[in-house]
Amino acid sequence: MKIEKININEIIEYSGNTKEHPEWQIEQIKNSIQEFGFNDPIAIDEKNIIIEGHGRYLALKELGYTEVEVIRLNHLTEEQKTAYAIAHNKL
């Protein structure tokens, strides 16, 4: 697995994302990024669609980031992408 940097505007939010991120949560994520840095790459697929990391993506956009680190999970099937997202949102 390789971490790469891409322009934040190339990332696409997954339209089927069921997890809501209220503003207070985005604020907490922003505070964490400001204090500790951004060290948890966003997981995306081969089309740059977010699999996991919507909250971090929203926080980074609000903070004005133009490039972000991502991990491409091109090898996952659609079912595996869904399972991955669910598993990470339960943690």
Spell out what each predicted region is:
Residues 1-91:
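Short, charged/polar connector segments at secondary-structure boundaries
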